[in-house]
């Protein structure tokens, strides 16, 4: 095996960090788009 136990936690932390930032960002953009659409 290619030393998977050492590389796996880094991949998991990176995956959690990306999703932890991407999910609120998409929700934030969706809220702004909805607000501007309702204002018009």
From Swiss-Prot:
It comes from the Eukaryota. Its main location: plastid. One of its GO terms (biological process) is photosynthetic electron transport chain. SUPFAM superfamilies: Cytochrome b559 subunits. Disulfide bonds: none annotated. It is found in: Plastid, Chloroplast thylakoid membrane. Keywords: Chloroplast, Electron transport, Heme, Iron, Membrane, Metal-binding, Photosynthesis, Photosystem II, Plastid, Thylakoid, Transmembrane, Transmembrane helix, Transport. GO terms for cellular component: chloroplast thylakoid membrane; photosystem II reaction center. Its cofactor is heme b. InterPro entries: PSII_cyt_b559_bsu (IPR006241), PSII_cyt_b559_CS (IPR006216), PSII_cyt_b559_N (IPR013081). The keyword Nucleotide-binding does not apply. GO terms for molecular function: electron transfer activity; heme binding; iron ion binding. Heme binds at residue 19. With its partner (PsbE) binds heme. PSII binds additional chlorophylls, carotenoids and specific lipids. It is a single-pass membrane protein. The chain crosses the membrane at residues 15-31. This b-type cytochrome is tightly associated with the reaction center of photosystem II (PSII). PSII is a light-driven water:plastoquinone oxidoreductase that uses light energy to abstract electrons from H(2)O, generating O(2) and a proton gradient subsequently used for ATP formation. It consists of a core antenna complex that captures photons, and an electron transfer chain that converts photonic excitation into a charge separation. Heterodimer of an alpha subunit and a beta subunit. PSII is composed of 1 copy each of membrane proteins PsbA, PsbB, PsbC, PsbD, PsbE, PsbF, PsbH, PsbI, PsbJ, PsbK, PsbL, PsbM, PsbT, PsbX, PsbY, PsbZ, Psb30/Ycf12, at least 3 peripheral proteins of the oxygen-evolving complex and a large number of cofactors. It forms dimeric complexes. HAMAP family: PSII_PsbF. Belongs to the PsbE/PsbF family. This is Cytochrome b559 subunit beta.
């Amino acid at each position: 095996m290619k030393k998977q136990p050492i590389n796996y936690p880094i991949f998991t932390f990176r995956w959690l960090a990306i999703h932890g930032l991407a999910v609120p960002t998409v929700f934030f953009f969706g809220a702004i788009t909805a607000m501007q659409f309702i204002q018009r």
